[in-house]
């Protein structure tokens, strides 16, 4: 099986023994992004580490910028039928995420920057123009989730004021329906699913969190982003414990053979 770039999880390469050249094929990476990626790939693994071979290099692909970029999205929305083209672009990324293992998690890369100030503006613009688009609703929901995180901060709940929590909650009341409706229309849109897990952890909404976790695990069990949520859920700050962290690590370890980036 031929490996294609860009590659994030590199499931195909590790499972079928792709060559070093395939791992480092950057032909699909924009020229402006190649230097930083090459520098990361050239960094040797730490001595004495226990990661699977090349797992560290595989993670370099996580550092790539959002694609399509926020600038590309904003430009397309101003073009005739640009909203339709943008939806098709995201539909293609979604399809490749599940049907071409070498492109797994590029779907998450397509939602990488919507929590930035510019990303929030672009997501609002996209949603305002095509509120019926599941991809636009997921972007808008993710952007608002970013606002909720900013309002709350990252301290323990005991160190977070009621005003911060109230501000967070008001944002999440907007984000949840957007993300849920996006997932209803596109059941495999795992970035929206992961956001719902995040929200469930934030407000200790066990039914929401468990339902989203079950859905994510069923549709996208090898995704780095989905599996990282197991660790977030186990974090003592969100009601977990160190024992739960150990359990989550063991659960993820069972999937490492299929997706070494999870190591």
Descriptions of predicted regions:
Residues 1-4:
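Positively charged n-region of N-terminal signal peptides that target proteins for export
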Residues 6-15:
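Bacterial N-terminal signal peptides
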Residues 19-20:
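Bacterial signal peptide processing site
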Residues 26-52, 61-65:
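Long, charge-dense tracts
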Residues 26-27, 47, 80, 110-114, ...:
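A short, ordered amphipathic alpha-helix with a cationic face
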Residues 44, 77-80, 84:
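Short, flexible helical or helix-coil boundary motifs
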Residues 54-67, 71-75, 87-132, 139-259, ...:
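Short coil/linker segments at helix-helix boundaries
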């Amino acid at each position: 099986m031929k490996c294609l770039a860009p590659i994030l999880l590199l499931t195909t390469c590790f499972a079928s023994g792709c060559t070093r050249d395939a791992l480092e094929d950057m032909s699909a990476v924009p020229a402006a992004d190649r230097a930083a990626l090459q520098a990361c790939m050239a960094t040797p693994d730490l001595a004495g580490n226990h990661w699977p071979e090349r797992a560290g290099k595989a993670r370099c692909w996580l550092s790539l910028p959002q694609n399509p970029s926020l600038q590309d999205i904003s430009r397309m929305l101003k073009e005739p039928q640009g909203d339709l083209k943008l939806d098709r672009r995201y539909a293609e990324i979604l399809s490749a995420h599940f049907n071409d293992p070498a492109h797994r998690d590029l779907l998450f890369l397509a939602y990488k920057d919507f929590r930035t100030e510019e990303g929030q503006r672009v997501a609002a613009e996209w949603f305002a123009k095509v509120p019926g688009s599941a991809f636009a609703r997921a972007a808008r929901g993710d952007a608002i989730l970013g606002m909720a995180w900013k309002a709350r901060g990252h301290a323990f709940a005991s160190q977070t004021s009621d005003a911060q929590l109230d501000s967070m909650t008001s944002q999440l009341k907007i984000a949840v329906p957007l993300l849920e409706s996006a997932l209803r229309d596109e059941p495999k849109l795992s970035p929206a699913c992961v956001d719902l897990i995040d929200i469930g952890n934030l407000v200790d909404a066990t039914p929401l969190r468990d339902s989203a976790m079950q859905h994510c695990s069923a549709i996208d069990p090898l995704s780095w982003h989905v599996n990282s949520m197991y660790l977030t859920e186990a974090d003592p700050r969100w009601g977990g414990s160190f024992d739960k962290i150990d359990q989550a690590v063991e659960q993820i370890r069972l999937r490492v053979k299929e997706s070494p980036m999870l190591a």
